[in-house]
Amino acid sequence: MKLRSAALDLLAGKHASLLAFDCEFWHKGQAFLPREVGGYHLTRTGDAWTRSAPFFVVLPPPAGQLNRVSSKFSTTTPATAEVLDILEETERSAPEFLGDRDIVDVYFADSKVKPYLKPTSWLKGFAKLIGESVVVVKGDMDLKAIKSACAAHGFTFKTPLGIVDIAAHNPEFTKRCKTAKLEGTYDCIKKELDAGLKKAFPIGKAHDPVSDAAMAIQIAAWLVQKDVK
């Protein structure tokens, strides 16, 4: 998909690669590691941007991963979400009754998850793309998680060419919207967002990484064209 956008030009500066992405996480002790990764990659040629098809991948758990995957932060069918909720509550209250119902196995078997499973080696190429791009994120956890996973597997991680972190504007969002949460902020300002970018980056449910990345890049584009203070 090709598009022209002065806001995207401003976000990228002199660079020709924009990457908006979001993660949901595996939790291992105090560490956060990427579980679901989704978003969009844009490349500039002349005065036009080419937007990739949205990407979405699911990565394997780290060794020793606890069997807990929250439905709230997972891209699954409603039926699997219900099973995850039951298993999560069982694990919390009566783990002796779990038997063979491993939460991670249930999650991986879901029809919205299984087709997108990738080996850990996928991170190597994604880390390379990060190092060649200006990235758009909400908060620093996503980049930290990718960096930690790369370190754990011996992959090279280079700092992005630039970082547009919309969380830097959380005080302004809270003042205007009474919330700094991504979905709440988006709903608050969506009437002011660029119509072309809304079409290019459609919104689904919150905590779907592709949808969250779409909200983040639209908000980032709005920020560079607005005095939000």
What are these regions (language model features)?
Residues 23-27, 168, 215:
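Short, glycine/acidic-enriched loop or turn micro-motifs at the edges of active sites
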Residues 15-19, 24-141:
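Conserved non-catalytic scaffold segment of RNase H-like nuclease domains
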Residues 3-12, 23:
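Long, highly charged low-complexity segments
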Residues 68-105, 166-214:
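Active-site-proximal helix-loop-helix substrate-binding element of RNase H-like nuclease domains
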Residues 131-140, 144-145, 149, 184-229:
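Acidic, Mg2+-coordinating catalytic module of metal-dependent nucleases/exonucleases
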Residues 57-60, 159-173:
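A short, structured active-site edge motif that brings together acidic residues
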Residues 141-164:
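Substrate-recognition/cap helix-loop segment adjacent to the acidic, metal-dependent catalytic center
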